[in-house]
Design a protein with these regions (language model features):
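Residue-level signature of catalytic and energy-coupling elements of molecular machines
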Residues: 36, 47, 73, 81, ...
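Walker A/P-loop phosphate-binding motif and the immediately C-terminal alpha-helix
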Residues: 38-76, 193
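Amphipathic alpha-helical transducer elements in NTP-driven molecular machines
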Residues: 33, 78, 129-137, 160, ...
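Conserved catalytic-core segment of NTP-binding enzymes
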Residues: 142, 149-207
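Phosphate-binding P-loop
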Residues: 31-37
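Cysteine-cluster motifs in flexible loop/terminal segments that predominantly coordinate metals
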Residues: 1-29
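Switch II (G3) loop of P-loop NTPases
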Residues: 90-95, 114-130, 135-165
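Phosphate-binding loop that captures ATP/GTP phosphates
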Residues: 68-69, 74-118, 133
Length: 207
C-alpha cells in the first residue's frame, strides 16, 4: 500500500497493492492434494447460445493436445456437461476423507457436476442463490482435482450469484464469452463483459 493511500479505492489504479490484496482475499484454497494450473471460465449473458457445447469442445481440444483437462460444471440448476460426455447420474465417488472424486469421461476428462450427484438426471435442483454458490465452492475445494493443466468452468447465463462466486473464489485466468448475433443477445452479453471488466477478469475470446 502506498504511503500516500487515501483509502478511497475509487481514485486508485488497478495495480494498487491494497486493491490487489482485496481482490485475492476471497479466493478459496484447494486442498493440498489438488493441483489446478489454469482456470478458464465460459460465460454467456443469455441461455441457449451454445455455452456448454463450447466448454465441452475446448476441453476435448486441450485434452487432445496432451493436457490433463477438467470441467467444473457451475450451472447447478441446468447442468448439461455430464450428458454431453455420456456420463450417468450418481457417478461421483468419495475418498476416506469425504472428498469428492470427479467422474472421468471416456476421453479422460475429469468432470464435477450437480447432475452426477442426483439419483436421476431429470430431478430438479431447487436451491436458493447462496446454497448454489456454496455448492460451486465445494466443487472447487472439496473435490480431488489431481494435476489438472486446464480447468474449464461452465457457468450459468447472466451475472448473478454463480459468476460472482466464481470470479471471487476461484483463481480465474480469463473467460471465454459465448454469444449469438441477435441484437437482444448482444445487449445482454455486454452486461457479462462489463462485469468481467469491473472484476478485472481478462476476456480471452468471444465465440
Amino acid at each position: 500500500m502506498s504511503e500516500n493511500c487515501t483509502h478511497n479505492c475509487n481514485t486508485c489504479g488497478e495495480s494498487c497493492g491494497s486493491r490487489t490484496a482485496e481482490q485475492t482475499s476471497f479466493l478459496e484454497p484447494l486442498i493440498p492434494a489438488s493441483s489446478v494450473k489454469k482456470v478458464i471460465g465460459v460465460v454467456s449473458g443469455k441461455g441457449g447460445v451454445g455455452k456448454s457445447l463450447v466448454t465441452a469442445m475446448m476441453a476435448v481440444k486441450m485434452n487432445s493436445k496432451g493436457k490433463h483437462t477438467a470441467i467444473l460444471d457451475a450451472d447447478i440448476t441446468g447442468p448439461s456437461i455430464p450428458k454431453a460426455f455420456g456420463l450417468n447420474d450418481n457417478n461421483v465417488m468419495m475418498t476416506n476423507d469425504n472428498l469428492m472424486i470427479p467422474a472421468t469421461s471416456a476421453l479422460g476428462i475429469d468432470i464435477m457436476s450437480a447432475n452426477l450427484l442426483l439419483d436421476n438426471d431429470t430431478d430438479p435442483v431447487i436451491w436458493r442463490g447462496p446454497v448454489i454458490a456454496g455448492a460451486v465452492k465445494q466443487f472447487w475445494n472439496e473435490t480431488l482435482w489431481e494435476d489438472v493443466d486446464y480447468m474449464f468452468v461452465d457457468m450459468p447465463p447472466g451475472t448473478g450469484d454463480v459468476p460472482l462466486t466464481v470470479f471471487q473464489s476461484l483463481p480465474v485466468n480469463g473467460i471465454i464469452i459465448v454469444t449469438s448475433p441477435q441484437e437482444l443477445v448482444s445487449m445482454i452479453v455486454a452486461k457479462a463483459v462489463k462485469m468481467a471488466q469491473k472484476m478485472n477478469v481478462p476476456i480471452l475470446g468471444l465465440v
